[in-house]
């Protein structure tokens, strides 16, 4: 049974991380290690101990400087990882118990697999899934992944991680990481079952005050990286991916305008409304 290393960046995550950890401890696949990358100086293993969680599969590393960012934190976790496969879980999200066991056969075959991320409210009310219910299992490319607007949390063969996350990016770093994974693997295998709960909180990175401005700054970094050829993307998709990022930038600016007008909730709620209007 392969060892899976789970990467968890944690920044001021005391209120949510225990639930995320318990969702890992509840996995049907038992051979895993969870590497918590503390980016705020907090001792999350001590927090676990204080709450009755004593599990030798939990490990922790701290970033060199507080608030180094999610890319740097996850890269610290990758450097500690001992597993044959890697997976990513944010400290404010949760997995369903079959997440790893369902994706592992697909990742062993193709190298890279994901489930159908479900965006939900903290009370469990569904907002949207990355792909419609009833989507056929199969391979997806980078453009398909990007156009969902919902994060993907894959299980991947370790060698596909390359140099890890782009440390200079503090927003949309997961999109770029996944895009480059797909370029190395050739495609990502989709299991259209919602096994990751992407929990939408007002204070999360994508919804907190200033989030749309941070996204705008990230797009200002990413588009020149695409133009210069610094990112590993399939040549046949370069034009379409550049256009998709430009579209995402326009959508983010529209979200920013709605936020400033006081008419927007979370980004995922805004995105779901935009989809309904488009239909």
Placement of each model-derived feature along the sequence:
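Catalytic core of nucleotide-sugar-dependent glycosyltransferases
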Residues: 194-201, 207-234, 257-277
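Cell-envelope/extracellular polymer assembly enzymes that use nucleotide-activated donors
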Residues: 2-5, 23, 33, 176
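Conserved nucleotide-sugar donor-binding catalytic segment
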Residues: 137-219
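Short aromatic/hydrophobic "clamp" motif used to bind/position activated sugar donors
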Residues: 86
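Acidic donor-binding segment of Leloir-type glycosyltransferases
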Residues: 21-64
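Glycine-rich, basic loop-to-helix element that forms the pyrophosphate-binding segment
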Residues: 63-81
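Conserved donor NDP-sugar-binding/catalytic core segment of glycosyltransferases
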Residues: 98-127
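A conserved hydrophobic helix/loop-capping motif in glycosyltransferases and polysaccharide synthases
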Residues: 4-16, 20, 27, 37-39
């Amino acid at each position: 049974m392969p060892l899976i290393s789970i990467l968890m960046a944690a920044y001021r995550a005391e209120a949510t991380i225990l639930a995320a950890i318990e969702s890992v401890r509840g996995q049907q696949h038992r051979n895993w290690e969870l590497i918590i990358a503390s980016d705020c100086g907090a001792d999350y293993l001590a927090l676990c101990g204080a709450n009755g969680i004593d599990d030798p599969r939990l490990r922790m590393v701290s970033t060199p400087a507080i608030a180094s960012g999610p890319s740097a934190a996850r890269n610290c976790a990758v450097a500690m990882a001992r597993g044959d496969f890697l997976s990513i879980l944010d400290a404010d999200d949760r997995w369903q118990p079959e997440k790893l066991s369902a994706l592992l056969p697909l990742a062993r075959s193709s190298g890279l697999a994901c489930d159908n991320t479900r965006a939900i409210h903290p009370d469990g009310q569904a907002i949207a899934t990355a792909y419609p219910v009833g989507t056929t299992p199969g391979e997806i490319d980078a453009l398909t992944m990007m156009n969902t607007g919902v994060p993907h949390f894959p299980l991947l063969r370790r060698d596909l991680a390359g140099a890890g996350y782009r440390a200079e990016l503090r927003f949309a770093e997961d999109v770029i990481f996944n895009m480059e994974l797909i370029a190395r693997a050739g495609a990502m295998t989709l299991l259209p079952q919602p096994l990751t709960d992407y929990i939408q909180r007002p204070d999360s990175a994508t919804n907190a005050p200033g989030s749309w401005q941070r996204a705008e700054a990230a797009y200002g970094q990413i588009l020149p990286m695409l133009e210069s050829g610094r990112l590993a993307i399939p040549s046949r998709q370069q034009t379409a991916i550049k256009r998709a990022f430009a579209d995402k930038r326009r959508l983010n600016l529209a979200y920013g305008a709605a936020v400033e007008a006081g008419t927007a909730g979370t980004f995922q709620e805004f995105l779901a409304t935009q989809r309904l209007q488009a239909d």
